[in-house]
């Protein structure tokens, strides 16, 4: 994948949360993390600043109606450091209970130390310190069947969310967009639902109809 940012894991906090989740939840979390690493502009639905915090952000994932939130901070414009994960709670509750602001204040001036990730000592903790290493442990190295399947689905997920975001910005329904570019509404729906069997020529027509340029990895 063509990365814009690099995701790193701080200590074992996120890994303990991650490994406790069922496979479907882990996949959805990884789609969101893939989006953070590869998309220049990340939809606010998936990545936003936490108001009232000192440099904290949240990455969101959804699975079967449940919301999963990952607290993170930026080491610089190109490095995202994952701190902890939770099922949906209010921002106020998260900041009060876990008091990450104090921890960040101690580490924010020593960002290089923050990025020296420590491997957890508990059993069954993942041994990875970056998102790329996490993908290797979860799906195998680049080029293996499981990894190729994940990459294809993750790219389709990013494309689907990019299309939804751009379509809503210009105020078009799926039906209106389909009529504008001369295709079927069902085709727009398939893309927005993350299907991978999409013709490139149609993708370019769709985004041209939105007055947008599209950049993505071919899958």
Placement of each model-derived feature along the sequence:
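Basic, Lys/Arg-enriched alpha-helical interface segments
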Residues: 1-67, 76-80, 88-116
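Short basic alpha-helical hairpin corresponding to helix-turn-helix/winged-helix-like nucleic-acid-binding
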Residues: 34, 38-44, 48-55, 142-170
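N-terminal flexible/basic segments that precede or flank functional cores
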Residues: 106, 117-158
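Short basic helix-loop element that most often maps to the first helix and adjoining turn
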Residues: 118-124, 161-176, 180, 205
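Recognition helix of helix-turn-helix/homeodomain-like DNA-binding domains
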Residues: 181-196
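DNA major-groove recognition helix of helix-turn-helix/homeodomain DNA-binding modules
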Residues: 201-216
